[in-house]
Amino acid sequence: MTSDRILPTLVCASANPDKVYEIEQLLDGVVHLLPRPAEIPDVVEDADTLVGNARLKAMAILQVTGLPAVADDTGMFVDALPGELGVRTARYADDRPEHAETPYAANRAKLLDALRDKNCVSDVERAAHFVTVVIVCFPDGSELIVEGRCDGHIALAERGSRGFGFDPLFVPTPGVFAGDQRTFAEMSDDEKNELSHRGRAFRNLATHPLFSATLEFPCR
C-alpha cells in the first residue's frame, strides 16, 4: 500500500554539488530536500569540532529561510598524522577557515607526501577513518545530530575515477566482499553509499523516529 504521507521539508546547507548528489540519493523518499539558496554566502567554518561546523552551516540557512536545515561536516583521521586533518580535512592543503574547501587534488597530494615522509608503507601504518556528522536545526531551537564512521587505510597511489575528495585514496575495511581492496573511487555509487561514513550518517538520519509517519515533524 502506497503511503500518502507528506514528506517533511529540509533545506540542504551544502553548495558542494558532489555532496548534494550523495545526500539526495540517501534521503530520497524520506524528505523533500530543497537546494541551498544561491544568495547565501559560504560560512566561515572556524569551529573546533565537526558538530560545531555543521551547526554553523545549518543555522546560516535556517536564519535566512526560516525552514529546517540539514548540514554535514566530515573529517578524516589518519593514525600516522595525529591532529593534521580532522576538522580541517576539506581544506587540508590550505588551512585557512575562510577557505571552506581546497582543490581535491591538492589535498590528496599533500596526504600522500605526508605519509611518504613518514615512511608509512603498510596498510596498518596508513590506517585512517572518516567521521561524518549530520545535524538538522529546527525553527523551534531544537536540533537532531547523528553520525557515521568508516574505517580503512590510505592507498599508496590514487585509483579510480568516481567520487570526489579523498575517494581515490581511501580503501574501506571491510569492503564489499572478502579481500576487496578497491578505493571508494573504484566503487559504484550504491557500493560506496553502503559503506561510507556519509552513507551511514544519513541512513541514521533517515531511520530516526522523527521521520516516521507517527511523529510530528517540527515545522514543515
Residue ranges and their predicted role:
Residues 2-11, 17-220:
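Anionic-ligand binding patches
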